[in-house]
Structure formats: structure tokens, C-alpha cells
């Protein structure tokens, strides 16, 4: 499926080279998010390599048709200075651990720490254990028990596949009948393959949703500016959940106090908890939050840049991403500077998305667009 992401800038941005020493940077992943990451590194003057095929990146970097298993050997043979892992799957698979064992500098959490995204059940268990505010929930690996519990709840209600499902494993059911149907699809009919073998059933939260991403070095937390993405496929918050149909920053409805509450009651307690559990977190921790009438609550944790939030945030970032990544790895302090401009990104997806979409469609007119396209 061909997906085009384009980011409209409201003000003219002048890019400057933030790092005078050219380094070899390898970006794992080839989507819009990874294009934005590679673009940022290129603007800083670095030599770009990408694992995966991205025609736009191939114009200013080198795209590699190699497997995940071949990455360590390639890095050693080609003296790669930094590996930046974009997607969640390689992180959950433990790619960063393997690279570190080979003496290769890699940005991202360990396999154990990546469980925060790799398992909704694990994430919820950690939130419950350490009193991190979230929706009321129960988790199940037995369909009959899950169905019986669901029958006693009220709609709307949220069903979450335990494992990775490319951002589509969350179902907001408007009726219990729909919820029972989706539960059976997940647990009995393998709608999300093995990812739905276990599920989380949780209350539906109402409020203003926002994405709080932080650079994290063990117990040190460096919040980014916040962004908001739109997950539903259609206008007016309708349609199925997707990986994200657009994003913008900053947000007017979220205050500095809301952000501080998110950091102090959600992100900081979680990274402290991970460290205490022997799974120190290094990389990007994404907290999907909801500003409710009774305070900020946690919807989910991810262990990498949000997509499409990444595309707008990296255009807004006025600090060196290369320096940030290395300082996080080394446990050094990070200084984040941001442009004052506002940014909005719109995602164009193949017809039929997020269900089985059309493939091979030709996208025309890109040369007429005077704005970054990822």
C-alpha cells in the first residue's frame, strides 16, 4: 500500500547545519516517519543510510535491501556511527540489544523495555502496580471469561489486542453487540493474528487526547512539545482506527499544567518503575494521554516516535537529533530547542485503508507541492 504523507508549514523555515562533523547514520524503517528522521539527520549534515526502500530518501541517501538480521554485519563493515530504529517491531524483537552486543551505537529501548508497547497486558500491569492513572480494565487470554465479563459492562467500551497490530489493534465499540462481535474476531478468528490471543477490555475515556513524547535516559526525562494525531479513518472522528491520518502541533486546549501532570504522574513514574524492575528505558517513550474531567489518564505507551506526529515534531525541533540520540545513549543531559512555528501534517492513504487497500496506485503532482512530503 502506498501512503503519502505531506506536512504543510505555516511559516518559512530556514534550516541550518547543527552538527559540523559528518557521521554515518543508519535509519531502520522506510515509512513516512523514518523519512522524516532521515531528512532531519540530512539537514544536520550527516551521511544517510536506510534499511528499506524509500524512493525519496534514495535521492539524498542510500537505501539498503537487507534483512533485520543483516543489519549488525553491515554496520560493522561500513563503520556506521549511529543506528536509529524507527518502527516498533525491530525494537520489540530486540534489535537494539543485538547491536549493542556488537559494539554498535544504537538509539532505542532494549527488548525488555520495549514490552511497554509490545504487550498491552504488560503495560497495564505496570500501570496498575505503580499507580499510574489509566482507564479501568481487565485482561483475558480465555475467550469465554472475556465474553462473560464484557456482557456486564456498558458501551461504549474499548477492546485492545495485547500484541502489535500496526496501530489497528484498538477497537472502540459503540454497543455491547459490536463489542462481542469484535472480541470473537480477535480471540477466536485471529483478526490480528497472534496479537489478539490475549486482550484488554477497558472503560472508554472521554476528554481531549494528546501525544506526549519524551526522550528518556533511564530516569532522566526530556519532554518534547506535544502533538495531537487523528486516528479515525474519516472526518468527524468517524470510521475505524488507523495508524494515524494526520497530526498538528502545538495544541491550544492542552495547558502547560496538563503537560506537567502528564510528565509527573505518568511518564516519570513509569521510567522510574522500569528502572526499578531492572528494565531501564533509553530512547523515546510515547505516552498517549487523555485530559479527563478528573485529571490526565494514560491511554497507551509506545516506545518510539508516533507516526504521523514525528513528521511535524521533527520539523519543529531546532536541536540536533544526532546529538540528542548520542546524549541519551551516554546518559548525558539533553537540551531541547523548538521553533515557534505551528505545523500540521495530512496523511493520504490508499483507497480502502485501514482494511485491505488498493496497491500500485500512481501518485501524481508531487513536484508541484512546495512543502516537505514524507
PLM features: residue spans?
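Internal nucleotide-binding/catalytic subdomain
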Residues: 173-295, 299-308
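ATP-binding N-terminal substructure of ATP-dependent carboxylate-amine bond-forming enzymes
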Residues: 19-111
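Tryptophan (W) side chains
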Residues: 8-10
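Active-site "cap" helix and flanking loop/linker of ATP-utilizing ligase/carboxylase catalytic domains
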Residues: 262-285, 302-367
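Glycine/small-residue-rich loop that forms an oxyanion/phosphate-binding "nest" at active or ligand-binding sites
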Residues: 100-110, 116-117, 123-130
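Active-site nucleotide/adenylate-binding loops and adjacent lid/helix of ATP-dependent enzymes
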Residues: 26-27, 118-198, 228, 252-268
